[in-house]
Amino acid sequence: MRSARIAELLRPFLSGSCHSESGRRPGETCPERSRREPAVLSATQLDRISTYIDLLIRWNSRINLTAIRDREEIITRHFGESLFAARHLFPEEDSPQRHTRVGHDFSRANAGSRQSGALAPEVRIRLADLGSGAGFPGIPIKLWASDIALTLIESNHKKAAFLREVVRSLTLTNVDIQNKRAEAINQTYEVVTLRAVEHFGDALRVAARLTTPSGRLALLIGSSQLDDAQSTLPGVAWQPPVPVPQSQSRILLVGTVVPTM
């Protein structure tokens, strides 16, 4: 598929965070940054998305990665939703690669190391994608914010093999694939994402455990799951849900894990 068509299909998902009125509290105003025109993906990002789609369709004939077969629907349903979450989690300033870790100015701290081509590991944001499956939203988030350290948690061996092939083919660095159940993970992460998992309540509790205190938990879920999420994790400071573009029922729900005393 041509890069121009991919960019066109993804444009609605890369608009400013506040374009949807229903995602804001009464009286809340949009930051000036969020009123800008939709972000523009680079040629490299678009090429990687195209390669990813080809891999997904080829592997999907052998293992069940997605029920969606149409390329354009794959772009809007999988990549669009994932990049929508990416822009909310890591809103761009001068470029998609500049973002701030909790309590730490990432762009300034790494100014010298960026010039040398190395990144200080102590300031790299760690993001875990729980139940990663075909890699959504974790890998598209990595394509958007390449400086993060990404962990893909997937217990299914065949799906984990697919994830390794995607990471290799896209030449992604600082990506760790954990082929095990999330309950067996002892590491914690600044950001944990969750999308389309079984046993939703149990997965939520595991995701919260994997999130560092003051870290963020990001859920791409159906609106019917909103009450379950909020009641299952009442200790999370949830932001108002944000509707996903071009969907009647999908939402992005982001919350901060409140430190316990």
Residue ranges and their predicted role:
Residues M1-L46, F90-R126, V258-M261:
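Intrinsic disorder/low-complexity segments
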Residues M1-G16, A39-E93, A128, K158-K159, ...:
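Class I SAM-dependent transferase core
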Residues R36, F136-G138, L143-M261:
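S-adenosylmethionine
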Residues G131-G135:
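Class I SAM-dependent methyltransferase "Motif I" SAM/SAH-binding loop
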Residues L127-D129, L150:
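Short glycine-aspartate micro-motif
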Residues P26-G27, E32-S34, Y52, T188, ...:
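Generic detector of short, well-ordered, non-transmembrane alpha-helical segments enriched
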